[in-house]
Amino acid sequence: MRGFRFPLLLLFCCGLLFTLSSAPVAAQSSKVKLDSTDGFEIVNGKAGMATYRGQKAVHLMPLAGHELTDGSVFAILKGTDFKDGAIEVDLAGAPRPGADPSMKGFIGIAFRVQSHAEVSEMFYLRPSNGRAPEQLTRNHSAQYVSDPDFTWQRLRTETPGKYESYVDLEPGVWTKIRIEVAGAKARLYVNGASQPCLIVNDLKRGESRGQVALWSHETTEAYFANLKIE
């Protein structure tokens, strides 16, 4: 039996080495320093730096003449290649002065962005709905969409209530969101909650990949800070 000790020890060590080498490696966290707009591709708008409620932030704005029109502004983070993982950001959105009452301060994060924002998955918030006096309006506070085919109108018509939900929000107030993505599933967390406010188990583009982008509506005063990608 003494002659088997070394082979057994060698076998054990080899097995341990294989186990460690084949174990999944934890995703590394990457904090994006938002002290300049140089690292973004801006689509359908413009971006600048501002100090908002004590935080240095990226300020997304519509192009001149589009301040009250119905369109999207994207700030695509150059060099990102996101498939699975997590995205965190602090954001603050409120309707621009003079905006129609139906405009709710739409603001959010797009992921797996392709073709200069023609294609994307997205979670966004409607801050003005968060404390509305009617429950049905509150239930439209958080939204998932998938451009270009699955707009909020289509999703609400075909599957009412499945891709939007209530979450407590205030317009113009810093709000932390976290998006966790795995395969064709994604979850949205707000303000450090341990449970998601919105769960999507069938992302419309399946297991795709692409860039990460800040997003706002043209009628929104939109600010972003403390972006982190894991």
Spell out what each predicted region is.
Residues 1-6:
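N-terminal secretory signal peptides that target proteins for export/translocation
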Residues 26-230:
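Extracellular glycan-recognition regions
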